[in-house]
């Protein structure tokens, strides 16, 4: 709640509600897992069959039979794929499981993340300053071209995956692994206790389907809805796309009395360095210095 002195914050923990009065707020809640819309109800109704990669390690997968599908082409997808690939074989690389492993992505390929010394200059305060002062159209265009600066797979992981696939191919092992790029998931439904996934190839527009016993969606993260801020939403300025307007020093532009700072919610305004942990420390220092009124860091 916005108040004349700043904000009133209500926090519920273990069934108990606490009330805090403050002059300023820092929102650092991060992002939440994103699951394609056609899979959301299936994930809710059949969590043992469909889950986001964020939950991959919390509950061991069972029923690894038939088709097992990994969606996505980032680092998380690659690591899930490697783990499932290894579970098909024993220590002597003999096939011990009969499930078929499918790795699909709508991206044009399974590409490495840009991690060269000069490429990393995009994750610097200087580049953040440059990006901030572009207009909205320029920012949107730049972000579309920079996906592999913060998405993609590490070169080592790609090499490890290729080595595993190569070693099994030259050994004449039965093919149990399939990789498909440019495959856009357009529909999913549960049929006969399996998840039918319908894809459309981005180039040929040909449709095909897979009936999966298990689906792991390594499909990234998205900005949460921030329902807890609904009392102050009307006071916050937004751009034409509905994004929060954020100053260069990470303050929301709003009409309330105090300041609201944000962490990891400014991709649209500050660029690809937003989720970077190194820049996160720099961003936190700038916020702390403003709260203190002097340069501690």
PLM regions: where:
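Flavin (primarily FAD) cofactor-binding/catalytic cores of flavoenzymes
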Residues: 1-75, 79-297
């Amino acid at each position: 709640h916005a108040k004349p002195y700043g904000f009133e914050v209500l926090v519920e923990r273990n069934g108990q509600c606490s009330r805090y009065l403050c002059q300023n707020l820092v929102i650092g809640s991060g992002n939440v897992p994103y699951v394609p819309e056609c899979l959301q109800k299936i994930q809710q109704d059949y969590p043992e069959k469909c889950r986001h990669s964020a939950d991959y390690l919390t509950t061991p997968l069972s029923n690894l039979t038939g088709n097992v599908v990994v969606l996505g082409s980032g680092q998380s997808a690659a690591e899930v794929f490697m783990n499932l690939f290894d579970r098909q074989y024993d220590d002597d690389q003999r096939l011990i499981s009969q499930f078929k492993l499918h790795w699909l992505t709508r991206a044009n390929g399974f590409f490495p993340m840009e991690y060269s010394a000069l490429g990393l200059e995009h994750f610097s305060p200087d580049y953040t300053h440059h990006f901030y002062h572009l207009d909205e159209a320029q920012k949107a265009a730049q972000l579309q071209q920079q996906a592999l600066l913060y998405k993609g797979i590490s070169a080592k992981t790609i090499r490890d995956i290729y080595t595993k696939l190569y070693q099994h191919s030259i050994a004449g092992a039965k093919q149990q692994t399939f990789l498909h790029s440019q495959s856009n998931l357009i529909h999913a439904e549960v049929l006969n206790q399996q998840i039918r996934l319908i894809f459309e190839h981005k180039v040929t527009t040909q449709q095909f389907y897979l009936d999966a016993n298990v689906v792991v969606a390594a499909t990234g993260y998205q900005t949460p809805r921030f329902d807890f801020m609904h009392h102050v939403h009307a006071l916050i300025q937004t751009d034409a796309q509905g994004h929060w307007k954020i100053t260069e020093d990470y303050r929301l532009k709003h009409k309330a009395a105090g300041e609201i700072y944000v962490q990891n919610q400014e991709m649209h305004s500050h660029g690809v360095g937003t989720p970077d942990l190194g820049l996160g420390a720099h961003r936190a220092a700038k916020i702390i210095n403003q709260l203190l009124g002097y340069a501690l860091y």
